[in-house]
Each structure stands twice: as C-alpha cells, then as structure tokens.
C-alpha cells in the first residue's frame, strides 16, 4: 500500500524561528520514516522576513500555500526593529491574519513538567513531586479582546473613558467547550472550566453552556472554578488538573502563569485549531512554540528547539491523526532530557550542553 503523503506549510519567520523550525522538521522526518508515511514541507515567508522581502507580513504566496496545506508549522515573528511600523505591517499582523483566515478559535497549551527538570520549577518539590501534566484550552477569537463596543471616548464634561466589552454567544462557548471535553476524553477524563460567573453575565452564560455540553460527555468529570481561584490552585495543586477550559482573557493569563511551572518556555508548544479542515477531514492546525523570536540569540545555534519539536508532535496528533508518531516524538524528547542532554537555557551542572541542531538530531535519533 502506498505511503500517505501530508503537506506541511513551514513558516519559519524571524529571529530563532528558522533554527528551531529546522529542528522540528528534522524530527518530524524521522517520525515519518519510522511510522511509514511521508511529509512534504514547503517553506514560505511570514512576519518581519516577509515584510523585508516583499513589504507585507503575510504575502499572497504564503496565504495560498497555507490554504493548500494539511497543517501549518510556525516559528516566530517580531523584533525590536519592526516596532515603529504601522500595525498592519508589523510582523505580528501576519500571525493574526492566519488566525482570522482559518477561524482558529481554540488555543491548546500543554503544561508538562519533565521529571529531570523539576529543580528548574519555581514551585517546591512537595507541590510538584507528583507530576504536572495538564493542558489549557483557551478560546481565541472572542471575548473582551474582540467585543464591541470598544474604544476611548471623551465625555461632554471632558472625562476620558475607555471601554472594552466581554461578549460570548452560546454557540461560541459550546464549540470551545466541546473541544475541551473531547480532549479530556482522550486524556484522564477531567475538565476544569474557569469563569467569573459570580460577577460577570458572560461568565454565568459560560458556566451554563459548559454544563449543557457536559451532558454529551457523561464519562468526563467536570469542575468549575472562578478565575482568581483557578490562578491560585494552579500554584497549590497543579498535579490535580487535566484539561482547563477558559475564555480568551482568562486563558491568556492562566496559560502564561502555568508556563512558568515547567522551568523553561523553551519547552512549551502550542496549537491553534478551528473549523477549517484539511484533505483528511482533520483540523488544519497552526503550530507555534510560545517562546518568541529571541533576536538576541538568533543565528548562534543556542536556541532550544524542543518547543518547536513538541509542536511537531501536536501537529502529528491533531492535524494528521498520527497518535503513534506523536507519542514517539514526545517520548524521544523525554529520553534526551532523562539522559542529561540540555540546551543552554536548561543546563545544570553535570549535564551535556548541545546546540540547536545537535539537540534536534539527538531527539530524531531516539524516535522509534
């Protein structure tokens, strides 16, 4: 039987983006070889690199390639030298254009503390000793960041007033809740929903709709937490969480807080999924390490590629349906850390420091 071939649009972007993306491609090709399928990568400009070359952060050629692709592997965009540009020409505008084009309404942020790195976590061992492994499912295209009315106005008496509006429909809540429950069903079957229903009407609706969707998933245990309490419980009992479901605003805060539990943002991937489907009927996902472009170390072979590599594992799982290969990549990352291999950002005495390319090769060699 012929090997299936998957088409991946690769958008390295700026700063360390090209280096870490190359590392991810190395590992993904190793996974494809080990598990009997083919990956075809096509590289296109985005962000500052695209602006420098053609004057726009999201060229038509890149857009068309993303339309054709089964998934999008992204590096990073941005840098200080672009900060003076008009917003629609800044590198980040390319990222937002992609989210809007494919209605990427769900952002997935795995929070996993690898046992060899527990000393790098700011939390005490008695709190994290039992392990930390949960995922935050954040609604990405609604809520207070996009609600109307919004703006700054001057009242008749000269007072200036800033207005933002938290708006969610039941349909918007239901679709992100359903994705959260589906992910929980494939994990440890526990979902924690976060809201401020005690003081916000949007929060009351959020909780009501989550409970309605929960009836479709009787095998998943549901817990509701107020957002301020959720922030505290992440620090008190992080090992108790499995899937945490949150609105755009609360998910933004909580995912950054939770990221610090893991010891390094160089290890943290993310996936954005939505309604768009690829040729295989699976989400045309967008996969991005959270660490940013880090222009101060770009081109020095010092960047940690593990977040980008773990983005590759998420791509295999969510957009290609290759759970076997995804687990193999994740196990290979765990293996290199267990063996004491490190990049500069996570090194400690007694470990071997590898550059970006060497770390990627080390992971690829352990994919089987």
Swiss-Prot record:
The keyword Plastid does not apply. GO terms for cellular component: cytosol. Binds 1 Mg(2+) or Mn(2+) ion per subunit. Its main location: cytoplasm. GO terms for molecular function: 3-isopropylmalate dehydrogenase activity; metal ion binding. The record marks 145, 196 as: Important for catalysis. Substrate binds at residues 99, 109, 138, 228. InterPro entries: IsoPropMal-DH-like_dom (IPR024084), Isopropylmalate_DH (IPR004429). Pfam families: Iso_dh. Mg(2+) binds at residues 228, 252, 256. Belongs to the isocitrate and isopropylmalate dehydrogenases family. LeuB type 1 subfamily. Homodimer. This is 3-isopropylmalate dehydrogenase. It comes from Symbiobacterium thermophilum (strain DSM 24528 / JCM 14929 / IAM 14863 / T). The lineage of its organism: Bacteria, Bacillati, Bacillota, Clostridia, Eubacteriales.
């Amino acid at each position: 039987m012929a090997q299936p071939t998957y088409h991946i649009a690769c958008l390295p972007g700026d700063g360390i983006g090209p280096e870490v993306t190359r590392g991810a491609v190395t590992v993904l090709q190793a996974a494809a070889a080990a598990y009997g399928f083919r990956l075809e990568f096509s590289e296109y400009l985005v962000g500052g690199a695209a602006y420098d070359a053609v004057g726009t952060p999201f060229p038509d050629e890149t857009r068309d390639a993303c339309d054709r692709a089964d998934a999008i592997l992204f590096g990073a965009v941005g840098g200080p030298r672009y900060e003076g540009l008009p917003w629609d020409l800044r590198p980040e505008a390319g990222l937002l254009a992609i989210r809007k084009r494919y209605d990427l309404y769900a952002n997935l942020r795995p929070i996993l503390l690898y046992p060899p790195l527990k000393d790098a976590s700011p939390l005490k061992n008695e709190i994290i000793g039992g392990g930390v492994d949960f995922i935050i499912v954040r609604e990405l295209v609604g809520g207070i960041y996009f609600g109307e009315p919004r703006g700054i106005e001057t009242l008749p008496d000269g007072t200036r007033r800033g207005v933002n509006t938290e708006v969610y429909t039941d349909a918007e809540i239901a679709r992100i809740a359903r994705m959260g429950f589906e992910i929980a069903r494939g994990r440890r079957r526990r979902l924690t929903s976060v809201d401020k229903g005690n003081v916000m009407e949007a929060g009351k609706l959020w909780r009501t709709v989550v409970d309605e969707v929960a009836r479709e998933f009787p095998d998943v245990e549901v817990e509701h937490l107020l957002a301020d309490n959720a922030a505290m419980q992440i620090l008190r009992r992080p090992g108790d969480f499995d899937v945490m479901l949150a609105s755009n605003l609360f998910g933004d805060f909580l995912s950054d807080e939770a990221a610090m539990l893991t010891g390094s943002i160089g290890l943290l991937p993310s996936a954005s999924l939505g309604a768009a489907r690829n040729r295989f009927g699976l989400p045309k996902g967008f996969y991005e390490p959270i660490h940013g472009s880090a222009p101060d170390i770009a081109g020095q072979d010092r960047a940690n590629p593990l977040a980008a590599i773990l983005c590759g594992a998420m791509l295999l799982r969510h957009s290609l349906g290759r759970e076997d290969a995804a687990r193999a990549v994740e196990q290979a990352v765990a293996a290199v850390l267990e063996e004491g291999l490190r990049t500069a950002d996570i090194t400690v005495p007694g470990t071997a420091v590898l550059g970006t390319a060497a770390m990627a090769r080390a992971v690829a060699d352990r994919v089987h």
